[in-house]
Amino acid sequence: MLKRFFITGTDTSVGKTVVSRALLQALASSGKSVAGYKPVAKGSKETAEGMRNKDALVLQSVSSLELPYEAINPIALSEEESSVAHSCPINYTLLSNGLASLSDKVDHVVVEGTGGWRSLMNDLRPLSEWVVQEQLPVLMVVGIQEGCINHALLTAQAVANDGLPLIGWVANRINPGLAHYAEIIDVLGKKLPAPLIGELPYLPRAEQRELGQYIRLSMLGSVLAVDRIMA
């Protein structure tokens, strides 16, 4: 059984967190135990409990087990620390150990990335290098907006060039007024080398909703049944 997935996006703010939430909820509804994992979270805020990131808290809220925050988000960076101009080395061993620990506890771990596939960490390395090291299959979130076809095709090509399998994509309608939505979905369906596994409509406060019904796990049926996928 394939245990771990990495969620990337065509850009920043395209809905990786709400899609991760939807996938976690869909898997949980199918009877699986799940955990969300946000290895590096930028723009975190200081709280009485320590540094916290709103996206990581969403993942924590839909995980099957009651896990400490640090198990969901081992590296929480403040707004200042998130800048590539701020030298803050990333402990990739810590990220790997955290992922391994979660993988031992649940059936599936949904790993949410930071920014897009080539978004740089503070050490000027993309998180995708760690994803390649961990050999995680990739699900892509496409924020449906002007220019998203180009961004989606470039992201899919970059994932393939890195030797990882793109096992599916999710359309997230982030612009309710966008014309030609259906045509964009049709073109992406024809051009992307992976199946469309879900469409999320535009929903206010989506991070607080039940979203599992928008994910078609049947499109991942054969993928979920194997231990590893080759690109």
From Swiss-Prot:
ATP binds at residues 13-18, 55, 112-115, 172-173, 201-203, 208. Keywords: ATP-binding, Biotin biosynthesis, Cytoplasm, Ligase, Magnesium, Metal-binding, Nucleotide-binding. Its EC number is 6.3.3.3. Pfam families: AAA_26. GO terms for cellular component: cytosol. Pathway: Cofactor biosynthesis; biotin biosynthesis; biotin from 7,8-diaminononanoate: step 1/2. The active site is at K38. Its cofactor is Mg(2+). It is found in: Cytoplasm. HAMAP family: BioD (MF_00336). Catalyzes a mechanistically unusual reaction, the ATP-dependent insertion of CO2 between the N7 and N8 nitrogen atoms of 7,8-diaminopelargonic acid (DAPA, also called 7,8-diammoniononanoate) to form a ureido ring. Gene3D superfamilies: P-loop containing nucleotide triphosphate hydrolases (3.40.50.300). The gene is bioD2. Homodimer. GO terms for biological process: biotin biosynthetic process. Belongs to the dethiobiotin synthetase family. Signal peptide: none annotated. Its main location: cytoplasm. This is ATP-dependent dethiobiotin synthetase BioD 2. It comes from Salmonella typhimurium (strain LT2 / SGSC1412 / ATCC 700720). Mg(2+) binds at T17, D55, E112. GO terms for molecular function: ATP binding; dethiobiotin synthase activity; magnesium ion binding. It catalyses: (7R,8S)-7,8-diammoniononanoate + CO2 + ATP = (4R,5S)-dethiobiotin + ADP + phosphate + 3 H(+).
